[in-house]
A protein has these predicted regions:
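N-terminal binding-site loop/beta-alpha segment at the start of enzyme catalytic domains
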Residues: 6-92, 149, 155
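Glycine/proline-rich, positively charged
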Residues: 37-40, 44, 54, 103-222, ...
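Hydrophobic faces of well-ordered beta-strands that scaffold small-molecule active sites
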Residues: 27-31, 64-66, 94-96, 128-130, ...
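Short, well-ordered alpha-helical microsegments
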Residues: 75-79, 169-174, 273
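Structured C-terminal cap/extension of enzyme domains
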Residues: 46, 57, 61-62, 81, ...
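Residues that line or immediately flank small-molecule/substrate-binding pockets and catalytic motifs
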Residues: 33, 68-71, 129-132, 166, ...
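Structural motif corresponding to the early beta-alpha repeats
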Residues: 70, 86-106, 131
Length: 389
């Protein structure tokens, strides 16, 4: 895209390698363990996950990312089963996070941290991030001395590098990094749709990280899969390039920026793994023709009122009505993209046992948890108007 392309080419020389501030990382692509292969009984398919881990490490990658709340704790234990119990400790990098909904005061943090080590089957974390930082929960972390406790754990050798993951405006990020210059790395949402988005502020947050000389980890490079399920006319533009999956352009876009040391992808099956590894094993930045194509894709997507939900499910964890909000938003997006029959079919399937959009009581708990700052209550009213007939 015109703005993005100028920004990238000023900072990334074709053929150069990424900075790799942290030498433990073998490549600039990581396995996000928020969305794993699942069995029908709701458990992680550790047989399939183990195969994916083997393929990932076998291709020369070694970075894994999890959090205590991912899959209700099953992500951590699946990593113990499929990764840490099967490989020597120096074969992988493991990142975990301190999530605000799992502690209230300083005394809660060390026991929680120890439980995370045990769940993952390790003695230390390579990276430990203050999770989903924003203006509101940063006050909770400060009052509980979360950063100070993490720095103490680092001195004890239980954390190698301290970082944050972030979901808020650039000025808040600037404030946090100014308050705690000991933070070594920042994880931000970054993709070609959110680059100039005023809600997510990918570009502005990127600029703040560069201002503070902080290496960057990227989450949501395909925006929860929405940059894989493109409208037909947008997809045709990428198809015209003559090769590469839709995910490949999104992930390579993020990885092409100077200072971005790691791009995460949540891979739920071996097909995703195979595709991602194929173009990140020997990474090359996007060329001018590819940037121009992405610019056209952005214009098409922005011309349509799609709901920018990433399916993180933070909202559903808070919803007292058990409304499957991300799935209902996906149905609405399908309808907008003219997949009318499938949208109605899936809506009825997802709500067969309750949780229809019209059951929202407008408590607002979902909106306070949403990293995308979506007006979920209003959006559910629109969903209800479309499907609850």
């Amino acid at each position: 895209m015109v703005v993005q392309m100028q920004f990238v080419t000023q900072k990334y020389t074709k053929g150069c390698k990424y900075m790799n501030t942290f030498k433990e990382a073998k490549k600039n692509f990581g396995f996000g363990c928020m969305r794993l292969p699942m069995l029908e009984n709701g458990e992680v398919d550790t047989v399939e996950f183990s195969k994916m881990v083997d393929a990932f490490i076998g291709a020369g990658f070694n970075y894994f990312d999890t959090a205590h709340g991912y899959l209700n704790g099953k992500s951590e234990t699946a990593l113990r089963t499929s990764l840490t119990s099967r490989y020597p400790r120096d074969a992988y990098i493991l990142t975990n996070k301190l999530s605000g909904n799992h502690f209230e005061k300083e005394e809660d943090i060390r026991p929680l941290f120890q439980s995370q080590l045990e769940a993952c089957g390790v003695d230390y974390f390579d990276f430990y991030l203050m999770h989903a930082q924003n203006k509101k929960n940063f006050e909770q972390y400060k009052s509980a001395r979360a950063y100070e406790t993490a720095l103490e754990l680092k001195k004890e050798g239980k954390i190698r590098h301290l970082g944050i993951s972030f979901h808020d405006s650039a000025d808040v990020l600037d404030m946090i990094l100014s308050s705690y210059p000991q933070v070594e790395i920042v994880q931000i949402q970054f993709n070609y749709i959110d680059y100039e988005d005023e809600g997510v502020q990918s570009r502005k947050c990127y600029d703040v990280c560069r201002k503070h000389n902080k290496p960057i980890i990227v989450m949501e490079p395909v925006k929860g899969g929405s940059l894989v399920s493109l409208p037909e006319d947008a997809g045709a533009i990428l198809d015209s390039l003559g090769g590469g999956s839709y995910a490949s352009y999104a992930i390579r876009y993020a990885a092409s920026f100077d200072g971005i040391e790691m791009v995460l992808s949540g891979m739920g099956n071996m097909d995703m793994m195979t595709d991602n590894v194929s173009y990140m094993k020997d990474f090359t930045p996007l060329d001018e023709k590819e940037y121009e194509a992405i610019d056209k894709v952005v214009k098409i997507i922005r011309s349509r009122p799609l709901i920018s939900c990433t399916d993180c499910k933070y909202c559903t964890e808070r919803c007292p009505q058990n409304i499957p909000i991300p799935q209902l938003f996906a149905c609405m997006n399908d309808h907008t993209k003219l997949n009318l029959w499938r949208a109605n079919y899936l809506y009825n399937k997802y709500t067969a046992e309750g949780g229809r959009a019209n059951e929202c009581i407008e408590c607002g708990a979902c909106e306070s948890a949403c990293p995308q700052k979506l007006p979920i209550r209003d959006l559910l009213k629109a969903v209800s108007a479309q499907f609850d007939k």
